[in-house]
C-alpha cells in the first residue's frame, strides 16, 4: 500500500450553507464540488486548498452516521482521508495486520473515489478513510 498524501479532512456540520460561509468567504478557499452521497446519506461541499481538501458533511437523514456523530459529539472533525494508489491492495494489507475496517469492500464516495474506513480502535482514536482516485 502506498499513501499518496492527505486527500481531505472531513468535517461534520449542522448546516452546509452556514459552514460554507467560513470556509469559502472568510478563508477564501475555492469551493470545487457539491454532491449528495446517497450510500452514506450525506451531502458534501468540497473546498480545495491545492494542498489538500476540506470536505464539509451534513446528514441527509436521521439514520445517517454523520447525524449520529453530530448528536453524540457535536459538529467538528469527523475523519482524515488518505489517498492510496490501490484500495484493494490496501484492504488486503490492513486485514493481514488485523486492522479493523468498517467496510470490507470499497464503496464509492464523493467525487467517485473508492473508499474504505478504518475503525478508530485501530488508529488510536481517529476515524481514517482511505481513498483511491477514480481512473
Residues covered by each model-derived region:
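N-terminal beta-strand motif that seeds the catalytic metal site of vicinal oxygen chelate
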Residues: 1-18, 75-84, 134
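Vicinal oxygen chelate
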Residues: 1-2, 45-48, 82, 91-135
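Short, structured motif recognition centered on aromatic/hydrophobic residues
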Residues: 6, 10, 23, 47, ...
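Amphipathic alpha-helical segments
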Residues: 17-30, 94-97
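Short secondary-structure junctions
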Residues: 27-36, 99-105
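A short, acidic/glycine-rich surface segment
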Residues: 32-33, 63-68
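Mid-chain, well-packed structural core segment of small domains
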Residues: 69, 73-97
